[in-house]
UniProtKB/Swiss-Prot annotation:
The modification Phosphoserine is found at residues 52, 286, 289-290, 397, 410, 1079, 1566, 1569. Inhibited by brefeldin A. Expressed in placenta, lung, heart, brain, kidney and pancreas. One of its GO terms (biological process) is protein transport. It is found in: Cytoplasm; Cytoplasm, Perinuclear region; Golgi apparatus; Golgi apparatus, trans-Golgi network membrane. One of its GO terms (cellular component) is nucleoplasm. The keyword Protein biosynthesis does not apply. This is Brefeldin A-inhibited guanine nucleotide-exchange protein 1. Phosphorylated. In vitro phosphorylated by PKA reducing its GEF activity and dephosphorylated by phosphatase PP1. One of its GO terms (molecular function) is myosin binding.
Length: 1849
């Protein structure tokens, strides 16, 4: 303790003694000083003696450390201040220096605190007086330089010392003094020191403020922990409801900042604006990272370094006042470092943070920035990073109203600590200093004004760059930035002094990076009015443009900033489209447009272009970086066996919604980020990409509407209304005109002035929306005319003024000046005239005041307005004309004005004028928005990039294309290529196809590979383009889609180029390509094909040219390019499932182009296809099958290429691939092999070349031989190929194919039957095809044998079929044997039967029925139905051969064979088939008899007969019904009605009239029977005959022929009728055969005749065979049905035979040849059969019940017959009846007497009549017997002896 005291006393004593020793002090005017010094020395001496320590005590501590605080020590130091104060006031530099030096040391070591109140000025502390005294030592520029340094040193110590506190005005005074020393001092060292000191002071002031808040927050945290101890487990919440340091410090509102603080700084500005306000308290919520938090220490160190640059050797502890200036500087540095290091008090060590991980730096800056030299009291801790509190709500609140309306101080904005007030005052002072205008004329770099401006800007920049959380978020500071700094910037941002301009830009950058969330409007103004304006205007200097673009380079490199600009401005309805304009401007610069007028040198232009490109590329890189989470790098994954991480894993890795992105990246591969956007990424409103997109669309609509309005107002308004952006009422439109500043004022005026009713309503609403209350008349008029330009027409102005006057009076009803609205109206008009008169350059003689007053006489209801009132109006208008408000947008000078800039001097002049105007506008706008709270959204979603890119892709593309096109500079080219690459990446990941394709096409175009002028011009940039294209393919393959086409086309051409470059002959397919005539092309003076192919040379060759081309292309063959190209193909395995399909699809397309080349087909891509097929075969099957779909299709085409070599290559490649693919095997139920092998089928089907076909068959045979065990679904293709080979005419092909098929069927089936089941059908089909090849009959027979062999497999292995599952899962397991086994075999056999020559088909038929008979017992019922459907196909008319002879042969051989075979099978399996098949068989037979084929019809009836006779015994009643019905149907269908109705054609053309009488109704039971009469009468509405079914075809044809006036229309009809007649006859015979057994009736007739000849009826003789017939199985009803048929047939025949006229007509028409047609046989046989049945029933004891009906029928039929016989005229006709009569008489004779009675009495008269005919002897004999019997029965006579035997029943 004593030591400390001693040191202090030593300082004081030495200093006082030194002052006293100075010779100046001895002078009289220093007597007061001298006295004070002596008194002080006395006191010190006394004090020292009093407090000397005991001798034995050790020295305590170091002498320079501040002593332990205690009251006793410290009060005294302050009371010795008076001598120093007086010393400082002396004019002697030496004394002043000594005094200052001592004060500095006392303060530094804590001996002088100045805490006591100042006795001279109440309310102040001593320290304030001390500082004032120190500052007072600076007397302006003439102050001694040593003293200047001492002042600086003392002030720095005072401001930075831990031991004293100075605030408010005192701090300002200290800063101000240093500032003034910097400006005033002539000494460079002093200037430098002053500047460094200032920086240091500011750092400390701001750091202390931040620190205090931090400490307090920590304190609060501790408090909270103490209170909520139970919450310790849970993590500390990151969002504190409000920041703690606002809680308990005495608030001081802004209004307490007294004016005097701003003393000498020339800052006599008003107090802080009253309107500094917001609705929430300022809060400390910052997102700043620890690195930035501690940035200040680093800067202190830097400041210290700056100082130490001037140091010289330090000469020990020389405290003399003769210290050299350098020593003072050194001292300051040393002491600063000591203070800084020494003061890192308790708890502030570098590793104070709990975990010590200082490296958690969010913005990517290096941790080295954190240095261990903290500012006094600045704890360096990473553990606490205050996060953003709910303050964000106020930041993005929608309170965009200007808060100027609210008067009075805002209660909200308060300082929570005096330190904040200090910082605020300093900051505000610097802003105001920077705003001071420079003197007119060219700026002088040495002038105070300019140096002050530059210094203030530098200091502001330093404050902003080191800003901590409080500064960044506290509302006071934010408002200060808005109100002072931004306004200052708007002034300095257009400075023509480069240094000022550059500093402004740097400050703007800092603001953009750290404060953008608060400065939305300000940033907009800066961009719009300064940056973009300078870029766009043609007159701005190169330097300005250069600096702006340098700044933009920084902005564009920061992803957050770029996206934020788009989201906050381009997507904001009220903001300018800054992003869009920026990109467009940069694009123009990058294209070098507009640089000519600037008079730039070429070098300057190029560097500007490069910078422009660099910015564009940076923007794209940012967009890539921003959306990188959407991108999947194909090379970081493989599709072979790996899947993408699941959604869940993804979200664990990174939550995409709120990723904080900082900075951008250096290359597309990099993931590092650096840059300026590292602050408060989350300081945002909600970031919803969809919402922003909607906003952007609305904005575009509004802009479009405004554009339209500015051309045609009505059109614009209509458009906006259609789009729903504008209401329809006049009020809505008026409001729109008020608010929308982008409308053309002239058009607004025209619209309002229009006489249209609606326009008037809008105008009234527009005026009514103004509020003129309380305004004087001229102000109101000014306000009214601000918004639009008055139209030219008087009537329009008239209407507007009238309404204005009315509204003015309405708003100001209390006024007494105007008698009525008329007065106001006239006055308004006169004011407008006055303003035109006074301010228009056209008016030469201006109106005087007197004239004006005179003009307005009597306008106030015939009275005058007061003269002084009019005079005031005149004066005001003369002073300022009435005009529209200046529009916000500065108009950029038009093109015409650009050309007029003749010289550089003129340009400068023009530019300065523009700059001045610009500064004015910018400042006005800045001030206007300084109170506006605009919500700022910090973008977080990667989705924004898509609309950004869609908006700007064209200018990007233009810039890059132009760059590549017209500039050979390598740097430009590499920037363009990088840009294009980024653009492609963005278009890719957001799958924006059009844009992606455009960029890829551009890239492809600049490779020069695809252009016709070709490779001759290839330069380095084109080579680089090729490399870029390849890189894109490599990195973005997953997204390229259709763009693969361009890329693969280039790669294909590149291969060709490489061949030329290396001089190698391309590997053409056939060595040399044959020309059309087959001669070899290529003569001496022709260029090789490949040159022609690339469009390089014409016909004749310049070999030198070729050599140079080879050289320029050489680099395309460099190893790197070749490897990179290969990598695309080998890397194809990493493409995802969709991408690989696109890749393959386009590779195939390119390959097709290569192969189709007329001059020289190439196979480069085809080989690549084979390669990638190998690489990708391991993909999951699903993907592979999609790939193969494309490749397979390509092989299909290539395999059919007319060039055989190409096809051979294709087939061979296919074979190799297939072998590899088959090796992998296949699981059950998959179909991949089938898809894979399909090209073989296609080639076989389409390619007619024997070589290729042979090769295909050999390939397949090889597969079967080597891979049979692995083949599953592939069997289908194999059989399909052999099926195609089977019909070949080339023996070797057929032979090889058949051999292999045989091998499969006999051996492979044996071993691998289950694997082949799926294609079992195909195998059978294939064999069937071999059987049908007529050229090789032996093969055919062998094939049928193999089919028989297949049947054996099915029979032996039914289980295999049952177990087999496949696509047709709807087939029940038990049916699978049928569907997959039996049915195919039988079906194919039926095909063979239908297709082959007689011997083969007969063999087929035999085998078919053999199989049925052999294996039929295993068949289910429903299988038989299917089977017979096939069998009946043999009779299918459509399948029959056309030629008549063959048809006949077919009928006689195959059909008969088949019909009988069917009967056999039916009979064999009757039990199963009767109820299943009988209907079908009957239907088939019914169908047979309807065909126009006699043979078929006969077979049908025969078959019916056979089936019934063979099986009738087993028929049920039901089946018999069916049988009868079938017979009935056939009968009815085949009655040839047309024989009766047909008429010969009366005229040549007209059809015959309908016959007036129809003998019987056309009762066609079956649709299929058609009456001629019927079909000639068209029934359909449209008068076309309805087409009847098959059997009517002839008739139908007949009709159509009648209509087409054919010569012999009847022939076809007659043929059909003839067949019907035949069938009728056959059918009668059939019924007879069925009922009585074949040949029975014939026998009976013969016997009857014989008996008659013997003249004896042997009653006892019974026919033995009677019971063989089916009679006994038929019921009486069924028999009656058959009877009805027979009798109908009989009656028809009778009718026809009786119709002589008709028969003659038919005969004449050529029906039935030589004689007249008749139906005698039908007439007689039908009746005969009927009679037999009736008599049989009559005699049948078992049918007693039916006897009565039988008798009745008999009587009717017989009497009718006899009557008819009597009418017959022709001998031959009667002859035909002989047997019939014999039968009738014989049968009647055999019945019992009782019955005979009934019959004889009935027939008696008729029989008597018969006697008159010339009958044959036999008949006569029987008649005789009859009459004799009558005699006996009726007892007319006695019976002769021999006849007594007749039974008398």
């Amino acid at each position: 303790m004593y030591e400390g005291k001693k040191t202090k006393n030593m300082f004081l004593t030495r200093a006082l003694e030194k002052i006293l020793a100075d010779k100046e002090v001895k002078k009289a005017h220093h007597s007061q000083l001298r006295k004070a010094c002596e008194v002080a020395l006395e006191e010190i001496k006394a004090e020292t003696e009093k407090q000397s320590p005991p001798h034995g005590e050790a020295k305590a501590g170091s002498s320079t450390l501040p002593p332990v605080k205690s009251k006793t020590n410290f009060i005294e130091a302050d009371k010795y201040f008076l001598p120093f104060e007086l010393a400082c006031q002396s004019k002697c530099p030496r004394i002043v220096s000594t005094s200052l030096d001592c004060l500095q040391k006392l303060i530094a070591y804590g001996h002088l605190t100045g805490n006591a109140p100042d006795s001279t000025t109440p309310g102040k502390k001593l320290i304030d007086r001390i500082i004032e005294t120190i500052c007072g030592c600076f007397q302006g520029p003439q102050t001694d330089e040593g003293v200047q340094l001492q002042i600086i040193k003392a002030l720095l110590t005072a401001v930075t010392s831990q031991h004293i506190e100075i605030h408010e005005g005192t701090v300002l005074q200290a800063v101000r003094t240093c500032y003034n020393i910097y400006l005033a001092s002539k000494n460079l060292i002093n200037q430098t020191t002053a500047k460094a000191t200032l920086t240091q002071m500011l750092n400390v002031i701001f750091a202390r403020m931040e620190n205090q808040a931090l400490q307090e927050a920590k304190q609060m945290e501790k408090e909270r922990h103490r209170q909520h101890h139970h919450l310790l487990q849970s993590p500390v919440s990151h969002h504190e409801p409000e920041s703690p340091q606002l809680r308990y410090l005495p608030p001081q509102t802004v209004d307490h900042i007294s004016q005097e603080h701003e003393g000498d700084l020339d800052l006599h500005t008003n107090d802080v604006d009253k309107s500094l306000q917001d609705d929430t308290e300022p809060e400390n919520g910052s997102d700043i990272s620890s690195a930035e938090n501690e940035q200040t220490e680093a800067d202190q160190a830097t400041a210290a370094e700056t100082l130490s640059k001037n140091e010289v050797l330090y000469d020990g502890e020389n405290h003399d006042c003769e210290e050299k200036p350098q020593d003072i500087v050194q001292n300051i540095v040393e002491e600063m470092v000591n203070i800084v290091v020494g003061d890192m008090g308790e708890g502030t060590t570098i590793n104070a943070s709990a975990d010590g991980n200082i490296g958690t730096i969010e913005d990517g800056s290096d941790s080295e920035n954190i240095q261990a030299n903290g500012i006094p009291g600045t704890p360096i801790s990473v553990a606490y990073t205050p996060s953003l509190p709910d303050d964000r709500l106020s930041v993005s609140s929608n309170d965009t109203q200007e808060s100027g309306n609210s008067s009075g101080p805002s209660p909200g904005a308060k300082f929570s600590h005096i330190l904040q007030k200090d910082a605020f005052l300093v900051f505000r002072s610097l802003c105001k200093l920077s705003m001071k205008p420079l003197s007119d004329g060219p700026p002088d770099p040495k002038s105070h004004e300019l140096r002050s401006k530059i210094l203030s800007l530098q200091l502001l920049l330093s404050i902003l760059q080191n800003a901590g959380p409080i500064f960044r978020t506290n509302e006071m500071f934010i408002n200060a930035i808005k109100q002072y700094l931004c306004v200052a910037l708007s002034k300095n941002g257009v400075s023509s002094v480069p240094e000022v301009f550059e500093l402004s830009l740097s400050i703007f950058l800092t603001l953009l990076s750290n404060f953008k969330t608060h400065l939305k409007m300000q940033i907009e103004v800066f961009f719009k009015e300064i940056f973009l304006y300078i870029l766009e205007t043609s007159t701005s200097s190169f330097d300005h443009k250069w600096m702006v673009i340098q700044t933009l380079t920084r902005i564009c490199a920061d992803a957050q900033s770029v996206v934020d600009i788009y989201v906050n401005y381009d997507c904001d309805l009220n903001a300018a489209n800054i992003f869009e304009r920026l990109v467009n401007d940069l694009s123009k610069i990058a294209q070098g447009r507009g640089s000519q007028e600037l008079g730039m040198s070429n070098v300057q232009e190029l560097s500007l272009r490069k910078k422009g490109l660099e910015c564009l590329v940076s923007i794209l890189k940012c967009m890539v970086e921003w959306s990188k989470d959407q991108y999947v790098n194909p090379n970081s994954q493989t599709t072979l066996g790996q899947e993408k991480p699941s959604e869940q894993e993804m979200s664990e890795i990174k939550h995409p919604e709120t990723i904080n992105r900082y900075g951008s990246l250096n290359s597309l591969e990099s993931t590092s980020s650096s840059g300026i956007g590292s602050y408060s990424t989350q300081m945002s409103g909600t970031d919803n990409p969809e919402q922003f997109e909607v906003l952007k669309q609305q904005k575009e609509i509004i802009e479009q509407g405004i554009d339209l309005f500015n051309k045609k107002p009505k059109r614009g308004i209509q458009y906006l209304q259609e789009q729903g952006m504008l209401g329809t009422t006049p009020e809505d439109i008026a409001q729109f005109l008020h608010q929308e500043e982008r409308l053309d004022s002239t058009q607004v005026g025209e619209f309002l002035g229009d006489n249209d009713k609606f326009n008037k309503e809008v105008m009234y609403a527009y005026v009514d929306q103004h509020d003129f209350s309380g305004k004087d008349f001229v102000s109101a008029l000014r306000m009214f005319l601000e918004g639009f330009r008055l139209p030219g027409e008087a009537q329009k102005i008239d209407r507007l003024m009238e309404k204005f006057a009315a509204r003015y009076l309405e708003c100001n009803q209390g006024q007494t000046l105007f008698a009525s609205a008329d007065t106001a109206y006239v006055l308004a008009y006169s004011i407008i005239m006055l303003t035109t008169d006074l301010h228009s350059p056209q008016v030469k003689n201006k109106m005087t005041k007197e004239q004006y007053i005179k003009m307005n006489r009597g306008i106030n209801d015939s009275k005058d307005l007061p003269e002084e009132y009019l005079s005031a109006i005149y004066n005001e208008i003369a002073g300022k004309k009435i005009s529209m408000k200046e529009t916000k947008e500065l108009t950029i000078p038009t093109k015409s004005s650009k050309q007029n800039v003749a010289s550089e001097k003129q340009r400068r002049l023009l530019y300065n004028l523009e700059m001045e105007q610009m500064a004015k506008t910018a400042k006005a706008l800045m001030e206007a928005v300084s109170h506006v709270q605009a919500p700022f959204t910090s973008a977080t979603h990667l989705e924004h990039v898509r609309p950004m890119f869609k908006l700007a892709w064209t200018p990007f593309l233009a810039a890059f294309s132009v760059g590549l096109q017209d500039c050979d500079d390598t740097e430009v080219a590499s920037l363009c290529l990088e840009g294009i690459r980024c653009a492609i990446r963005i278009a890719c990941i957001f799958s924006i196809q059009l844009e992606r394709d455009a960029y890829v096409q551009a890239l492809a175009r600049f490779t020069l590979l695809t252009v016709s002028s070709g490779i001759t011009e290839m330069k380095q940039k084109n080579i680089d383009t090729i490399k870029t294209l390849i890189t894109v393919a490599h990195t973005d393959g997953n997204y390229l889609g259709n763009s693969w086409h361009e890329i693969l086309k280039c790669i294909s051409q590149l291969e060709l180029a490489q061949l030329i470059g290396t001089g190698v002959k391309p590997r053409y397919i056939s060595g040399t390509v044959r020309g059309r005539e087959g001669s070899l092309t290529g003569t001496k003076d022709q260029a090789p094909d490949e040159f022609v192919g690339l469009g390089l040379v014409g016909g004749n060759v310049d070999w030198k040219q070729i050599a140079s081309i080879q050289e320029s292309i050489g680099e395309t063959s460099s190893q790197s390019v070749v490897v990179a190209v290969d990598r695309i193909f080998t890397g194809s395995t990493r493409l995802d499932g969709n991408a690989i399909v696109d890749f393959v699809r386009w590779l195939c397309a390119v390959s097709m182009d290569e192969l189709l080349s007329t001059t020289h087909p190439r196979m480069f891509s085809l080989q690549k296809i084979v390669e990638i097929s190998y690489y990708n075969m391991g993909r999951i099957r699903l993907q592979w099958s999609r790939i193969w779909e494309v490749i397979g299709d390509h092989f299909n085409k290539v395999g059919c290429n007319p060039n055989e070599d190409v096809a051979i290559f294709a087939v061979d490649s296919l074979r190799q691939l297939s072998m590899k693919f088959l090796e992998k095997g296949e699981l059950a139920n998959f179909r991949f092999q089938k898809d894979f092998l399909r090209p073989f089928e296609h080639i076989m089907k389409r390619n007619r070349s024997p070589t290729i076909r042979d090769m295909v068959v050999r390939c397949i045979a090889q597969m079967v031989n080597s891979q049979a065990a692995n083949i599953r679904s592939g069997w289908k293709n194999i059989f399909s190929v052999f099926h195609l080979a089977a019909s070949d005419q080339d023996e070797s092909i057929v032979e090889l194919a058949f051999q292999t098929t045989g091998h499969i069927v006999t051996l492979v089936f044996e071993k691998h039957f289950p694997a082949t089941i799926d294609s079992f059908q195909d195998a059978v089909k294939c064999l069937s095809e071999f059987a049908c090849n007529a050229a090789f009959p032996d093969t055919s027979m062998e094939a049928i044998r193999l089919i028989r062999h297949c049947a054996k497999y099915v029979s032996d292995r039914p289980q295999a079929f049952k177990e087999y599952t496949s696509d047709d899962m709807n087939v029940a397991p038990e049916d699978r044997v049928w569907v997959r086994g039996w049915f195919p075999i039988l079906f194919e056999l039926s095909c063979i039967i239908n297709r082959c020559k007689l011997d083969v088909r007969t063999r087929g038929l035999t085998v078919m029925f053999e199989i049925m008979k052999t294996y039929g017992h295993t068949y289910e019922k429903h299988w038989w139905q299917d089977l017979f459907r096939i069998v009946f196909r043999i009779f299918d008319n459509m399948k029959l051969p056309e030629q008549q002879t063959e048809k006949a042969e077919w009928m006689t051989t195959t059909c008969n064979h088949a019909l009988y075979a069917i009967c056999d099978v039916f009979t064999q399996y009757l039990e199963v088939l009767s109820d299943v098949l009988l209907d079908d068989i009957f239907a088939q037979l019914y169908w047979c008899v309807q065909q126009d084929n006699e043979q078929l019809a006969r077979s049908g009836t025969n078959c019916l007969e056979n089936v019934v006779i063979l099986n009738g015994e087993k028929f049920t009643l039901e089946i018999w019904d069916k049988t009868c019905n079938c017979t009935l149907d056939i009968f009815k269908t085949t009655i040839p009605h047309a024989l009766l109705t047909w008429r010969p054609n009366s005229g040549e053309t007209a059809p015959p009239p309908p016959s007036p009488v129809s003998e019987k109704p056309l009762d066609t039971i079956s649709q299929k029977s058609v009456d001629i009469h019927d079909s000639i009468q068209p029934r359909s509405v449209d008068n076309r005959p309805q087409a009847p079914l098959v059997s009517a075809s002839a008739v139908n044809e007949e009709v159509s022929k009648i209509k087409s006036t054919a010569k012999f229309p009847e022939q076809k009809l007659f043929a059909a009728l003839l067949i019907k007649c035949v069938v009728q006859l056959e059918l009668i015979q059939t019924i007879d055969n069925i009922v009585f057994f074949p040949a029975t009736s014939k026998k009976e007739d013969a016997e009857n005749l014989a008996a008659a000849q013997r003249d004896a009826v042997d009653f006892d003789v019974r026919v033995d065979t009677q019971d063989q017939g089916m009679y006994r199985f038929l019921t009486s009803q069924q028999l009656f049905k058959l009877l009805d048929c027979l009798l109908e047939s009989h009656r028809f025949a009778k009718a026809f035979n009786s119709n002589n006229e008709q028969r003659t007509a038919l005969w004449k028409a050529g029906f039935k040849g030589k004689s007249k047609p008749n139906l005698l046989k039908q007439e007689t046989s039908s009746l005969a059969c009927g009679l037999r049945i009736l008599f049989r029933m009559y005699m049948d004891e078992s049918r007693v019940s039916a006897w009565e009906e039988v008798q009745q029928r008999l009587l009717n039929v017989c009497s009718e017959a006899l009557s008819y016989f009597l009418t017959l005229t022709s001998e031959s006709h009667r002859e035909a009846w002989t047997n019939l009569l014999l039968l009738f008489l014989t049968k009647v004779l055999k019945i019992s007497d009782n019955r005979f009675k009934a019959h004889a009495s009935f027939y008696y008269p008729l029989l008597c009549e018969i006697m008159q005919f010339d009958l044959i002897p036999e008949l006569r004999a029987v008649l005789r017997r009859f009459f004799l019997r009558i005699g006996v029965v009726f007892q007319i006579s006695q019976p002769p002896e021999q006849e007594l035997g007749i039974n008398k029943q």
